[in-house]
Amino acid sequence: MVRYMVTSALPYANGPIHAGHLAGAYLPADIFVRYLRLKGEEVLFICGTDEHGTPITFRALKEGRSPREIVDEFHEHIKTTFERAKISFDFFGRTELPVHYRLSQEFFLKALENGHLVKKVTKQAYCEHDKMFLPDRYVIGTCPYCGAENQRGDQCEVCGHPLTPEILINPRCNICGNPITFKDSAHYYIRMQDFEERLKKWVESQEHWKPNVRNTVLGWINEGLEERAITRDLDWGIPVPLDDEDVKGKVLYVWFEAPIGYISITIEHLKREGKENEWKKFWLNLDGETKVIHFIGKDNIPFHAIFWPAFLMAYGKYRDEEVEAEWNLPYDIPANEYLNLEGKKFSTSRNWAIWVHEFLDVWPADYLRYYLTAIMPETRDSDFSFEDFKKKINEELVNNLGNFVHRAMTFVNRYFDGVVPERGELNDLDRQALEEIEKAFKETGELISNYRFKDALKRVMELAIFGNRYFDYQKPWKTAKENRERTATTVNVSLQIVKALGILLEPFLPDASEKIWHLLNLEEVKKWSFEELPAGHRVRKAFPMFRKVTDGEIIYFIVNYIGRGNPDSAKILLNKYYKQEDVVKVTLERFGEKRKDEALALLKSIYGDEFKGEKPEKAGKAEKKEKVKEGKKMEYVSFDEFAKLDLRVGKIIEVNDHPNADRLYVVKVDLGDEVRQLVAGLKKYYKPEELLGHYVVIIANLEPKKLRGVESQGMLLAADDGERVALLMPDKEVKLGARIR
């Protein structure tokens, strides 16, 4: 039986995780692993922080702290962020573990023993001002391949080509900014040319790889592989395990030892689980049944598809008292392209980024997972847009998925006391619905297996769309009056679709999946197969699964988070979407009176000289308040006139923005035997989530009228004192449609 060893690229422990990281290496892997678990496959999902190398020492130097303090802080921060984003690693380790030191030094010595390493004295970057050898990342200059400026000496962020300080144009120190020199220094190099032919044949045989990965790797190999240094002039890292004065005080290059972390972290995890030797079946080719799959971003393709396999080859066979075997080479490396932000590449140094931990302070993890999956850069770069984020969540997640689940759960509770009803005779649409469930499982599974996560999520959402159309076509609110059996069948089939969605969503939206499982009152373990909800099973009462993303939330996020890190970036984003007066108003409301000075200072830092300040109260507003206080002269109506009004109790089941008006909502109200669409001027006073699920009073026999192009089939009743608006709501639940007398 096939087993899976799944890894995500080890993040550097020198800073937080942004949405580009998540979309590239972590969310795709999590979707894949959750699917495998639902299928009952044997799978191990491993990751951990990369805690050596220049990114860590560079940050420590800038902040006047030790590298140990930096890695300890960010290991915990990154681990917590992944947990909040529902990334379900079996174990999240670190490369500061003793087992990693031991194994990395063992790999070095084995490669040396097998003749694949050579010691060379070469010119290394040196800063006369700081009196130190400079690691590649401490050197910046112009990329000789694409001409991009301010690129680090290890890899160009623009074209992705690996670099060395020697080939940079106009290289300078990234610490002090002065031009660098080059001094002699002894280092060990791996002879990559020893593996060129073997690597080429191996890559050519990987016909199941993504074309972008396979073509990139073959292009590299065809250019010819050269010796590359695997030791560095640093004092933080894994010491070179030799009694050699030439390399005394030097460490293993992080690009050599970091991927070994996949194995060392696996060993540590299984040792803690009391399965000390089980790591071998995942990493050694004992039976040909293990598939090692590395999820990475495209900048890591050469390191995982060329250098890492070469290190495994350089080690040779692993031998101990129990086994003798070759290492498992990667089975697949499904690298994603880049995620951009509003048309520009993510930049951590300029804070042009969506930091995951900050995003999750404002929105649920499922919102980020849904949007990143929907725009996942699987074969080409994609773009994170706040406007598109709002649109996709509100139209697809809330209006489609959430609406269907809520409708089905509401009807089973209203008409069948929360018990799944027996089905009657099936019509063609009923049968099609049940067939759609089976098709959704088959097709979604195939798409996930082929790393087409964007299409897989789309296929799941198509089932929710079908569910809504099925519900609309069957019209259970009408058949409930005349044909209970038909209504029972519609509700039963709808609940089967809801259960199917609860399983199908698990890889993508684990929290939504759990909410559906809770609504259906299920305790069974989810499996990637479908067993129908039995008639007679009791479910729970409906509640809204999602809330809409609002402009106020987006403004607050940009101001409070991006604005603090980089006011210029915040200004660009705010000016793209919003008027300054609206930004000021929302910010002051969100911060509140106690934090007003803080809010104004933040806005001033964002807008600079363009800041117009707090908008004064409109002239006449105070007069309006006074008029309300004075009140109008009472005018009487006859009882007969009042009796003409059909006032009824309803429940708000859906709230959408009006497509043509900024201050209006389009609200759907359930009256028991029908659902009415109303247009209401409540946007200034209520958020959508504050309206959903509430019982309200409407005028049901008001002549329908189009308001800004949308028909309103009644009117909500509310009190207005000139400053605040309050809906009229019954003080206890009554039957929907009950008349006000």
UniProtKB/Swiss-Prot annotation:
Protein name: Methionine--tRNA ligase
UniProt keyword annotation of Electron transport present: no
Protein encoded by which gene: metG
Alphabetized HAMAP family for the sequence: Met_tRNA_synth_type1
Keywords: Aminoacyl-tRNA synthetase, ATP-binding, Cytoplasm, Ligase, Metal-binding, Nucleotide-binding, Protein biosynthesis, RNA-binding, tRNA-binding, Zinc
Record GO terms (molecular function): ATP binding; metal ion binding; methionine-tRNA ligase activity; tRNA binding
Annotated residues for binding of ATP: T348
GO CC, alphabetical: cytosol
Sequence motif: 'KMSKS' region, positions: 345-349
Compartment(s) where it occurs, according to its Swiss-Prot or TrEMBL record: Cytoplasm
EC number of this enzyme: 6.1.1.10
Binding of Zn(2+), residues: C143, C146, C156, C159
Residues of the tRNA-binding domain: 641-741
Top-level lineage group: Archaea
